[in-house]
């Protein structure tokens, strides 16, 4: 059996920009993408803690170390600058892999810089 499991998440990131006129996606600081093992164009789910919105999109790299979290395209209607979000990536795993897999959880501070928890 195959299972759809959480691979990683960036927890409580703060939206730094929203660009309605971009084609789509979420721009994420390249450093955070690497820490969370999220590749460019990988599908991610975004959960907005402020308003309860949830949506799927794909990740694109932002400038390394910038703290950028920018919601692009139509999804910009679902988030505002300053909103707190969770960005989740998933992977398909067989039962044995899923039982032993430990997802990467990246906590960030108010500037979207990684912190140890």
Curated annotation (Swiss-Prot):
The active site is at residues 25, 58. The keyword Lyase applies. Keywords: Autocatalytic cleavage, Cytoplasm, Decarboxylase, Lyase, Pantothenate biosynthesis, Pyruvate, Schiff base, Zymogen. GO terms for molecular function: aspartate 1-decarboxylase activity. Pathway: Cofactor biosynthesis; (R)-pantothenate biosynthesis; beta-alanine from L-aspartate: step 1/1. Binds 1 pyruvoyl group covalently per subunit. Is synthesized initially as an inactive proenzyme, which is activated by self-cleavage at a specific serine bond to produce a beta-subunit with a hydroxyl group at its C-terminus and an alpha-subunit with a pyruvoyl group at its N-terminus. Substrate binds at residues 57, 73-75. InterPro entries: Asp_de-COase-like_dom_sf, Asp_decarbox. Gene3D superfamilies: 2.40.40.20. It catalyses: L-aspartate + H(+) = beta-alanine + CO2. One of its GO terms (biological process) is alanine biosynthetic process. Catalyzes the pyruvoyl-dependent decarboxylation of aspartate to produce beta-alanine. NCBIfam families: panD. Belongs to the PanD family. Heterooctamer of four alpha and four beta subunits. This is Aspartate 1-decarboxylase. It comes from Thermoanaerobacter pseudethanolicus (strain ATCC 33223 / 39E).
